[in-house]
Amino acid sequence: MVVASPSRGFKTLADLVTVAKAKPGTLTFASAGVGSASHMAAERLRVAAAIDVRHIPFRGAEGLNEVMAGRVDFYCIPVAPAVPLINAAKVTVLAVSTRNRAALLPNVPTVAEAGYPDAEYLFWGGVAAPAKTPTTIVHKLHDVIEKALRLPAVREKLATLGVEERLLTVEQFDKFVSDDMAATLVLAKSAHLEPED
């Protein structure tokens, strides 16, 4: 999701984009570091909205602190860590970056609803095993994890954290990861990002 410093006065994603277009290069976005999910989500928004905003990379959550302090304009963050900050009015939520509205924030529009469908970005997590793990072990791990994700207590806990689980087969997850990596490479090229040492 896209959150902004309350001191900036943005109420919608359109507000941020309007200012960014009127004053190219003046707005800033923080990230948890170059190439991090928060960086790539903001780059996807930057490219989709055709705005000139400056990236200020940090190590970890320090960038979010700078947004709350009003020294940086916006940040892209998963739903779970954002909700308490939104509720405490430490950040202003402008849009969620997922395809659908977040269950914990049903009144917040998606980036697509705000007019930028190409800015969709999914913050996701998964479980992986070393590359040479025998297939039988991988499938056993998958089965155990799937059983856990079907437990009502686990589903309820994930929902309270803003996590929407997706049960994929091993093969579907392999394809999902490959597709996501390919899309990230395309984004990196279109955003003119270069690898760092």
Predicted regions and their residues:
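N-terminal (or domain-start) structured segment
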Residues: 26, 34, 50-73, 85, ...
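C-terminal lobe and pocket-closing loops
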Residues: 82-150
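An extracytoplasmic/periplasmic, membrane-proximal ligand-sensing/linker region
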Residues: 48-51, 135-197
